[in-house]
Amino acid sequence: MQKTDVMLGDYLEYWFENIFSPRIETTTRMVGAYTLYNLILPSMEADIKLKYISVEYLDALLERVAKICPSAGNKGRELLSIAMKDVAGDKFISYNPMPETKPYPRAKPKVRVLGKEKLKVFLEAASKNPWYLEILLGLFCGLRKGEIFGLKFQDFDFEKQTVRISRQLVGNLKLKEKEFTVTEYAVIERNPKTENSYRILRVQKVVMREVKRRQQLIELRKTDPGIEYKNFDYVCCQENGEPRSLTAMNQALTKICNRNGLPNITVHGLRHPYVKPTTKKFITFFEVFGQPHSCP
């Protein structure tokens, strides 16, 4: 069989499992698997040989995909663009029609940011919550959720009042071949998101104080005969030292907001407590609320 006689559907499945998946992270593979097996392939009313692929065929396919959910068009076109680039690179086709297809812009994410007064209410409530330290790390240091979960006590320099960001925790999923079905899930350590994500940050005293309190609490847990503690040195962990579920912090934030009549805010929203409306320049939490001694 000639390369150009290969069917698009067959190629996409082979490409995703054998070419694309080995070069991406597992979380990216999960999104890709959903896009291919739940959006693109079911929307192919008629399969087509690679040599007959055209702008018109792809536009019609993506139009059907886009009707499934708001982000489907964007994610479908994104995955097909990567696949078709490999199709052309491997000489299955001499011309790649994807760049000429109709674009489906990514919807701008809506990050809910609490105003100054609501943030004060939120912070007062958070100060009485077991997640207080994690919330402070998001608000004061602008850390991502995975970075917060990946922090270890060895990353903090109490003398210099700094923290080193050098890892994150992410979900590691194994999917059943040719399906969007999770067969195995674990939380594992990974390098930070980008090279620029490796950094050393100054940490305010109010945060360092909470880190020290957490450290003392964990030392007590280690000596508790009723707890089989696993010492991974994580700052944010379960009672037995195991990593937290990656959804746990957002769930805790939702409870705090609901109990205090506040709009729900996510961990990502904690990273953006205040933005200048004209320059969009990030302002630290303390430029809004003052020095640490004024915080609960």
Which residues fall in each region the model found?
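Conserved tyrosine-mediated DNA breakage-rejoining catalytic core shared by Y-recombinases
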Residues: 103, 117-118, 151-216, 220
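Catalytic-site neighborhood detector that most strongly recognizes the C-terminal catalytic loop/helix
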Residues: 105, 109, 169, 273, ...
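N-terminal core-binding DNA-recognition domain of tyrosine site-specific recombinases/integrases
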Residues: 4, 16-92, 108, 243-248, ...
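Basic, Lys/Arg- and aromatic-enriched nucleic-acid-binding interface segment
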Residues: 68, 73-76, 89, 93-95, ...
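Short, polar N-cap/turn motifs at the start of nucleic acid-interacting alpha helices
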Residues: 155-162, 245, 264, 283-296
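Short, basic (Lys/Arg/His-rich) helix/loop patches that form interaction surfaces
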Residues: 70, 124, 128-129, 201, ...
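Basic/aromatic DNA-contact patch characteristic of tyrosine site-specific recombinases
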Residues: 1-6, 10, 60, 198, ...
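Short, structural beta-strand-to-alpha-helix junction motif
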Residues: 6-11, 47-49, 152
